[in-house]
Amino acid sequence: MEPESIEDYYERIAAHVGADGRLPVAVEEMPGWDIFPYEVDSLRLKPLQPPAATEPARRGEDAAACWCANPVDPDSDSLMWWNERWKVDLGFEGSGLPIMAWLSPLVHCDLGTMPPAVAAELGSLVGTMAGAIEGLPSVGRAQLAKYGDGGAHLHLLLMGRPARMLQLRGSPLLDWEENLPRVPSEVLASNGRPVARALAEAHGGWIGPAAQR
Ligand SMILES: [Zn+2]
């Protein structure tokens, strides 16, 4: 059997929608767990939409129009650490978590198109960051995400899940994050500093303004 088409995938799902075009909320699954941010009684899914005609272009799909066409700005407020091949930005536009840091290679690629040398270094960088994030007093666990539906250039999100706040465990962490009050930027900087230092120690490079305020 060949891998199925998206039309077949969609049709199988669409067969389960009710008269209002919605799938039922899976109360026996994660929506019913204690880590889910919303109460099931007041919840309904949005009407299911069919596949679009094409995948939309993402920001920086063309390398010439991507941020990586310009050198790293060492004065950038969001820059936490960088070296000759990688950079880490802090989420200064707002974070409800103790730390949210974006790791990107400076060479233009996505996860599926990484040059072998970039792929080889990625694991070690993620390990350094996760260890330093889990060393923060307000963090219980480091989480790692790769989405890439908005920007074409590879960016991995490392998040610090607040320590002992067990409701915030698992994949709903980002949904919680959107609803949490913002962490002050000076607190984000002091949490980012040990992570930037660990990166500089293990991978060279420089600590940026976001970890120095
Ligand atoms: Zn790029």
Predicted regions and their residues:
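Glycine- and small hydrophobic-enriched segments that form the cores of compact globular domains
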Residues: D75-D89, D110-A117, E121-L125, D149, ...
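Histidine-centered divalent-metal-coordination microenvironment in nucleic-acid enzymes
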Residues: P105, Y147-D175
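C-terminal helix-cap and adjacent tail motif
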Residues: P47, P162-R213
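Secondary-structure boundary elements
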Residues: G131-S138, E201, G205
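Active-site helix/loop of acyl-thioester processing domains in fatty-acid/polyketide metabolism
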Residues: A120-L136
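A short glycine-rich, hydrophobically flanked beta-strand micro-motif that places a catalytic Asp/Glu
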Residues: P137-G150
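Active-site microenvironments that recognize anionic phosphate/pyrophosphate groups
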Residues: M1-P98, W206-R213
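Short histidine-centered catalytic/ligand-binding loop motif
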Residues: A101-L125, W176-P184
